[in-house]
Amino acid sequence: MEISNDDLRDKTAAMKQQAFAVKAPLTIVFVFDTNVIPAISGRNPIVMEWVKLYTGFAAQNVYLACASMGLGTCARGSFKHDDLAPVLKLAEGKVVTLCMPVGVPED
């Protein structure tokens, strides 16, 4: 995986009401690789439900880690899918499932 210094935060904020996502210094992007399950690769509805479930498990750990460090986060499923995948240079078969901006809470 190639790490970029490009600022891609605007690609993770789908709506103006989600301006906090653009302000966050870090966004964790969860990606599912459909190629790891060759027999059922693609966007099989049952597989995608399991992917969402396991993404949720991982996201819960991010919530707990952030809370323990005094940081804030929020799981976001609404983002610009069509804009985000190309700028992340995702290979064929990789699907973004969730974005979690992380930062210091304003409150």
Explain the meaning of each model-derived region.
Residues 1-107:
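Acidic, surface-exposed loops and disordered segments
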